[in-house]
Amino acid sequence: MNETATSCQFCAISQSLANGKTIARKRPAQLAEVAKAAVELDNVKHMVMTTGTPQTSDRGAAVLCESATAVTTAVDLPIQAQCEPPDDDAWFQRLRDSGVVSLGMHLEAVTDAVRQRIMPGKAQVPLERYFSAFNAAVQVFGRGQVSTYILAGLGDSEDAIAQMSERLASVGVYPFVVPFVPIDGTPLARHPKPDNGFMQRLYPRIGASLRKHGLHSDNINAGCAKCGACSALKHHE
């Protein structure tokens, strides 16, 4: 959702578009061309495709299917797709059939108060819908192949994040917890990062949940949690 009243307060897509650093939509053929070159020239091992949160009932799943089909036709490259819960769980199998091997559906925040304040558009999708979608997606992609971003430092407490991470891990969803980093030009540009102590206390608690439920980032086929560059969670698995 790209309207100011409903957009995620941390999102910089509009700034990137305004500054000419990206285009509104990368066509499937463009993605396939770049993916093939990335594998051949830079030995890239996996790819992430995301749509933001388009105002369509499929929440971007249709364009992800089209794009993944183009890429996997051109090159053998594991793909993680990222979207919000679509209107129909049948989209998960369609994504899998198009070549997507891992899926991200991102909570960002874990309590309703923070969700309403930080991302009013995404907050219109209730947490219980996320969990019904998580359960359906895990049936298609497998345990540990579905993940969700959680941004620590937006206002959720340590306990709230740890408890949500345990709930997610218990159903086979990898809770990829990362410290919030403000981006210039966004409404949260002046919002503080979480302090080191907060993250140092939080990571071991999440790591315990990952071990308890047999989830490990190295086993993820593709995506952000597999890379892990923006979080220290890998060191606590």
Give residue spans per PLM region.
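Short, internal active-site loops enriched in acidic
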Residues: 52-57, 85-88, 153-157, 226-231
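Conserved strand-turn element in the central/C-terminal portion of the radical SAM core barrel
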Residues: 80-86, 134-159, 178-182
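Short loop/turn motifs at secondary-structure junctions
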Residues: 7, 43-45, 99, 142, ...
